[in-house]
Amino acid sequence: KQACYLAKKVKKHLKVPVSLVTSDRSRVTDFYPYEVFDRIIEKRSNNKFSKRYNDGALSHKKLEFNNDLRPLAYELTPYDTTLILDTDYIICNDLFKDVFDTTKDILLYKDSTDITLHRNFTEFKRISDTSIDFYWATCVVFKKTAFTKMFFELIEHIRQEWNHYANLYQLNTRIYRNDYSFSIAVDILKSDNIGLMPGTMLYSTDKDVLFKIEDDKLKFLVEKKDRLGQYTAVYTHKQNVHVMNKFSLNRMIGEM
């Protein structure tokens, strides 16, 4: 559902072909308007992890966490230049229209801000208190070059040797995360072939609730600081947003 919605937004604002990588092709083609995708690429996930997902401040569920296919993006993409997007990253403008002409091999987000513009989540600044800068794997541009091939091979190596790198970089989790592996790869390579995505990564946390979508306007209930279960209304207009509360995103897409 999220992938189909995002594909429509990408085609509206960026006017580029969209392909979907999924572990279950039939689930897409049997239940959703799959014609929005130019290609559907099936690749089975081998993950056995589960993760807690919040739906606002007072509700949560523990669900399967599939994140082992991102290192295979170089191998799977049918394009010479690729924009990778998580399905909970909502495109509401044409900010990315020029990224396909970048002179860099890879573009990533480093700087980020919460939709309130004043909450400060330190976990998105560095991958641990004593470690390296945080780079987002949510939204990535890459070209098919020898350097990029090496970059993604390094990402896969980090994934396979995750316990070693988690210890080396003093991480407080033993569950593999793409954001962390991309950050580690950037630190290891320290290359001018890696650049930054335009603008700033704008996000809402999974303790916030998306309660309305009106074209390119997103309306949220944002958790108040130190006020459990209390919210303030915030909206964004024509801004790309990483909506971490996937449950509320699904509900709003379902009502459209």
Predicted ranges, named:
Residues 17-24, 83, 107-108:
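Short, hydrophobic beta-strand segments that form beta-sheet elements in well-ordered domains
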Residues 1-8:
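Short amphipathic alpha-helical segment that frequently serves as the phosphate-/nucleotide-binding helix
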